[in-house]
A protein has these predicted regions:
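Acidic, proline/glycine-enriched N-terminal capping motif
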Residues: 2-144
């Protein structure tokens, strides 16, 4: 008699109550991890630029939530965050260095814990006139 295969256990994952909602908004380019902290005694603290970015990003996110009618879902819903970077010049930048501050400042507004966030950098290009970060945010279903 063949042994029954054990079911593969998944991470904690709730099915979204609002699976078809999508939130789109633009933000200024985030401060990179390299410019996020400064030394303060025995520790470190956020730079003024990082604190200002958090305020701006949270304000813009709140506006988008209100204007687009975004509804918060269950705690253990996973979210996809597609990111489109438009840099102001051709200087070499690591777009991945911008994720830490961005995800930390959106935590509590769009999702409960950035553990449940799947950030995906989709595109990086040049836009001298309007440098920005465009975000498309939506829940991931169990079958995706």
């Amino acid at each position: 008699m063949a042994k029954k295969k054990p079911e593969v256990e998944d991470l904690k994952r709730d099915e979204p109550k609002y699976p078809n909602q999508v939130l789109t908004f633009s933000l200024p380019l985030p401060v990179s991890v390299n410019h996020m902290y400064q030394s303060a005694g025995r520790g470190r603290r956020l730079t003024t630029a990082a604190r200002n970015y958090i305020k701006t990003a949270q304000d813009e996110c709140k506006k988008a939530i209100r204007s687009q009618g975004w509804k918060r879902d269950k705690e253990s819903v996973w979210y996809v965050m597609d990111l489109y970077f438009y840099f102001p010049d051709q200087r070499r930048r690591d777009s991945h260095n911008c994720l830490k501050l961005l995800t930390d400042c959106l935590e509590g507004l769009l999702f409960t814990d950035d553990y449940y966030l799947l950030p995906r950098i989709q595109y990086v290009t040049l836009d001298r006139d309007n440098p920005r970060l465009e975000i498309v945010f939506y829940p991931q279903g169990k079958e995706e």
